[in-house]
């Protein structure tokens, strides 16, 4: 598995917080606070019901679960295995069917081009050495006429 667009220190940083992804008052609380705004922004552009959506850089699945709860067929992608494990367990606890994968946007785009109605990539681009590669891969993942949603630090 190629991980050329991954920084080990970034993976380690998020792996250290893996057990705290779902602590709404913990170190990742800002993600919980902005999640309703994110979801409303996405929902304002597409009807989430039955849409096939990939959440690139999903971490512990905060946005991914919100998308699934809104009716989307959600896939969460991240390279932090500990975060993906937390996301999988939380989805099971909440009776949600979400396809979580330990892979990169680039690898998913090579394996499944033009296979999603929408892509989300929130606060992830600042954590990779080559953001343009992720953007290109997200564009390759979305079906013609689909949507790609990005958010990153200014």
Language model region names:
Residues 2, 26-30, 122:
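Conserved short-loop catalytic and cofactor-binding motifs
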Residues 7-8, 27-30, 59, 79:
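Conserved acidic
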Residues 21-24, 49:
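A short secondary-structure junction motif
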Residues 23-42:
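Conserved SAM-binding loop and adjacent beta-strand
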């Amino acid at each position: 598995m190629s991980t050329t667009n991954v920084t080990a220190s970034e993976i380690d940083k998020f792996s250290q917080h893996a057990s705290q992804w779902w602590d709404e008052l913990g170190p990742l609380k800002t993600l919980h606070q902005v999640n309703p705004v994110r979801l409303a922004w996405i929902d304002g552009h597409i009807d989430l019901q039955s849409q096939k959506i990939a959440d690139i850089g999903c971490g512990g699945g905060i946005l991914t679960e919100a998308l699934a709860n809104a009716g989307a067929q959600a896939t969460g992608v991240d390279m932090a295995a500990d975060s993906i494990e937390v996301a999988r367990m939380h989805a099971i606890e909440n009776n949600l069917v979400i396809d979580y994968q330990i892979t990169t946007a680039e690898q998913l785009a090579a394996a499944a081009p033009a296979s999603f109605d929408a892509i989300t990539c929130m606060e992830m681009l600042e954590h990779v050495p080559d953001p343009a590669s992720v953007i290109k891969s997200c564009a390759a993942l979305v079906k013609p006429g689909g949507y790609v949603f990005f958010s990153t630090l200014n």
